[in-house]
């Protein structure tokens, strides 16, 4: 985390974004595997990685909701762009957003080519005024109807 702070010029928030605040989530350190970094311990991918590679180090991270962070940093009600990549908890984050208070012009969400996850994301966003734009192997993009011209 300190390395991240050292190279950024924007605020860094030391927490995990989740559907509830104040929970301790366990993450495992995947060591030198730059592709995986750290993973939420409840993910099935993480469980298999832990077994296969004998990953031993884990740590707890306190959670905050996205709304809580937006309020804490006095975010405007309209945010041009947000990218959500939270290691399998994307739908948890989306379900906790107050879409009546915050509008995102364009949203990119990681879904790792998971059809079920894509369907849940689509239901949440389309019911809140977002229009599907594009998809690739890992991410799905939406634009808010107020900026789609």
Where are these regions (language model features)?
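Phosphate/nucleotide-binding beta-alpha loop and adjacent structural elements of enzyme active sites
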Residues: 1-149
């Amino acid at each position: 985390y300190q390395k991240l702070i050292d190279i950024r010029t924007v605020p860094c928030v030391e927490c995990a974004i989740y559907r509830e605040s104040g929970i301790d989530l366990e993450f495992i350190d995947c060591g030198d595997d730059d592709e995986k970094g750290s993973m939420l311990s409840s993910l099935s991918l993480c469980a298999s990685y832990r077994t296969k590679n004998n990953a031993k180090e884990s740590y707890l991270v306190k959670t905050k909701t996205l709304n809580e962070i937006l309020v804490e940093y006095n975010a405007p009600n309209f945010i041009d762009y947000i990218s959500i990549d939270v290691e399998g908890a994307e739908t948890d984050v989306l379900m906790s957003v107050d879409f009546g208070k915050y509008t995102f012009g364009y949203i990119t969400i990681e879904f790792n080519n998971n059809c079920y996850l894509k369907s849940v994301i689509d239901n949440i966003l389309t019911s809140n005024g977002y229009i599907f734009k594009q998809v690739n192997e890992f991410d799905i993009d939406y634009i808010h109807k107020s900026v789609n011209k």
